[in-house]
Amino acid sequence: LLFNEMAPRPHNSGHQTINASVTSQFEQQVRICAGLPIGDTTLKYDVRLENILGDLWFSNNSIGPHEPNWEELTGGVKILKLYGKNEPRVGRKMGHLITLIRER
């Protein structure tokens, strides 16, 4: 068994639990710290999470970064979460998009 990363906290690889699971990874951490039983981990939706990298701010061949057209990128149906970072850089995680595909 090989590990490439250990995170003793909620992690960005599980952010889809906020919208798609009965109990989010954030609530699970609070429950553990409070000595409560673990919550239901059942997925309510089939879900896809896509990372948003700083590359997107530089994608139109303009000089310098520009704010992406979020409405065009999300189509109004994806859940957009930006992390509030001030400076986009190529390869930097700036946020994520969650798509709830269908209810289970």
Kindly label every feature range from the protein language model:
Residues 7-59:
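Active-site "cap" helix and flanking loop/linker of ATP-utilizing ligase/carboxylase catalytic domains
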Residues 22-26, 69-72, 76-80, 99-102:
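Short, low-complexity, polar/charged sequence segments that are solvent-exposed and flexible
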Residues 1-5:
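Protein kinase-like catalytic core scaffold
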Residues 43-46, 52-88:
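Glycine-rich active-site loop/lid that clamps phosphate-bearing ligands
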